[in-house]
Amino acid sequence: MEGIQSGNKRLIAKAITLVESKKAEHRTQAEELLKKIMPFTGNSIRVGITGVPGAGKSTFIENFGRLAIANGKKVAVLAIDPSSSINKGSILGDKTRMEELAKEENAFIRPSPSSGFLGGVANTTFETMMICEAAGYDYILIETVGVGQSEVLVADITDVFLFLK
């Protein structure tokens, strides 16, 4: 808990992996963690970003994130990647498209597979946002799978919803 609040990126990533885990024994640990961090959530601005492939979602996020950091803010990016319906894998390549932002000390970029979950997000995106809020990130940017048609859930869990075209 203290490691998350202090902004330790390695521990933040481990906490996210815990809530993303499908193992039964991890569910109890994840629920306990979420209960502990709950009082430290709700202070971030959550921005959902969607659009057709090639619309510039990653470019927008990198530019916005770097500007926010230059103004003394901390930025977390939750990049949801599509999962293959055949092998359940995903590309998880958004970090490579946001190279400059990824180098920033006050940035945290976490790619996550959608795992076939509809709504443009992963089934644990809300819990992942809570972890990033508890870690003190001022902005949490959620990059959806990016079709623009089914990203309705992200609009329900964010403060601002952007559609880029």
Tell me the role of every PLM-derived stretch.
Residues 2-45, 55, 64-150, 155-164:
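Nucleotide-state-sensitive switch-loop elements of NTP-binding domains
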Residues 47-49:
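Hydrophobic anchor at the beta1->P-loop junction of P-loop NTPases
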Residues 58:
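Walker A/P-loop
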